[in-house]
Structures are given as structure tokens and as C-alpha cells.
């Protein structure tokens, strides 16, 4: 299996961490959208030219991290999957993952707002709203979190997403924006990053 994209992307790192937690062998080919040559290769894997892209052992190409995670869950089966098979538990975890996805996507949009526009074209109210949405989403999950994992005794995909996304958000969140008040998720990140599946996929954004 091949995972395309850099671990500096939280969505790529989430897939890589999940693969490691599932003890699945894979190759990572680092393709960045900011590199013209690499972007051209990436488009041959994903017509949208975005990461992650994923190639199965059968040569099937998958795009979008949620679709890739669904494939991996089905590959390892319900006993090992980080998404519970129980209907109510599954709904809870998927709701949490949805909130976390949204929070991360708002931070990505905020980064693009600053990095892709001339300074005089940045719309400050929109930027502030994006960062507030990230804050609201992460704090909502923090308020729901139990211990040692978000849903109690067993790690789920909500934990993987929360750790990977919090680590990424902390790297790029401006000091002039309200800080995230997520003590439970901070503790979760510290604990999870002591595990090799997380530590081996952690990269600082340049």
C-alpha cells in the first residue's frame, strides 16, 4: 500500500498513524502541493491535486481521508477497527470525528487566507471567524472527553483525529487569536505521542 503526501498535512498524518496502529505495512511517498513537479504527479493519483491519496495493494486509488479510513477499517475488521461496530458508539465517534474534521478544516482555511493573499487583501473578520470555529470545535470535543481516551477505556478514531489535529493547530495558530482551552486533549496528545504510531509520524511544519 502507498500513502501519498507529507506528514506535515494532518490529514495525511492521520492515515499514517492509523496504518501503524493497525500494523499494516505501507510506503509513504511525500508529495507536496506546493511543489509544481510533485503536484503534477499527485494529480495522476488524485484529480483534485490534494493529499492524502492512497493506493491499495490491488492498485485501487482512494482519495479523501475519511474514505481511506473507511477502507482501512474494513480491511482490518471490526475487532481491530478504531470505529466501533455498535450503532450508538459508532454514531458518537463519527460525530466527534466530524467536529474535529471541521475544526481542522477551518484552520487550514485560515492558513490559506494568510498565505495565499496579499496582506492588504486579507479579510480580518473572516479570519477571526475561522479561528473561532476551530476553537469552538476543539473545545466541544474536549468537553465531551473522558479518560484515558475520549470515549473511555478504548482508543478510537476520535482520539487519533484529536491528537493529530491538535498537534497541527498548535503549530500554526497565531498568538493574537484566542487560545484553545482543551486541557483534556492536551493531556491526550502528550500521552498518545509517547506511542510510536504517533511519534513516528510527527513532523514540524516548515
Describe the role of every protein-language-model region.
Residues 1-124:
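GST-like domain detector, emphasizing the conserved glutathione-binding G-site
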Residues 9, 87, 156, 182-183, ...:
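Serine-centered coil/turn micro-motif
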Residues 69, 73, 94-97, 138, ...:
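Non-transmembrane alpha-helical segments in soluble domains
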Residues 80-85, 149-153, 178-179, 199-204:
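Short, hydrophobic secondary-structure boundary micro-motifs
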Residues 100-190:
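GST-like fold's C-terminal all-alpha helical module
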Residues 135-138, 143, 193-206:
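Charged/polar, low-hydrophobicity segments characteristic of intrinsically disordered regions
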Amino acid at each position: 500500500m502507498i500513502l501519498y503526501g507529507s506528514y506535515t498535512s494532518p490529514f495525511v498524518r492521520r492515515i499514517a498513524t492509523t496504518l501503524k496502529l493497525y500494523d499494516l505495512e505501507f510506503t509513504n511517498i511525500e508529495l507536496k502541493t506546493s511543489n509544481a513537479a510533485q503536484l503534477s504527479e499527485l494529480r495522476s493519483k488524485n484529480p483534485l491535486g490534494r493529499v492524502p491519496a492512497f493506493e491499495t495493494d490491488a492498485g485501487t486509488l482512494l482519495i479523501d481521508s475519511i474514505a481511506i479510513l473507511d477502507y482501512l477499517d474494513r480491511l482490518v475488521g471490526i475487532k481491530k477497527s478504531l470505529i466501533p461496530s455498535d450503532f450508538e458508539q459508532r454514531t458518537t465517534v463519527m460525530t466527534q470525528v466530524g467536529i474535529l474534521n471541521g475544526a481542522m478544516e477551518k484552520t487550514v482555511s485560515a492558513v490559506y487566507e494568510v498565505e495565499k493573499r496579499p496582506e492588504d487583501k486579507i479579510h480580518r473578520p473572516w479570519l477571526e471567524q475561522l479561528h473561532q470555529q476551530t476553537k469552538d470545535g476543539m473545545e466541544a470535543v474536549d468537553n465531551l472527553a473522558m479518560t484515558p481516551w475520549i470515549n473511555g477505556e478504548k482508543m478510537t478514531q476520535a482520539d487519533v483525529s484529536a491528537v493529530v489535529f491538535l498537534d497541527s493547530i498548535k503549530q500554526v495558530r497565531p498568538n493574537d487569536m484566542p487560545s484553545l482551552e482543551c486541557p483534556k486533549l492536551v493531556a491526550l496528545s502528550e500521552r498518545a505521542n509517547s506511542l510510536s504510531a504517533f511519534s513516528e509520524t510527527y513532523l514540524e511544519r516548515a
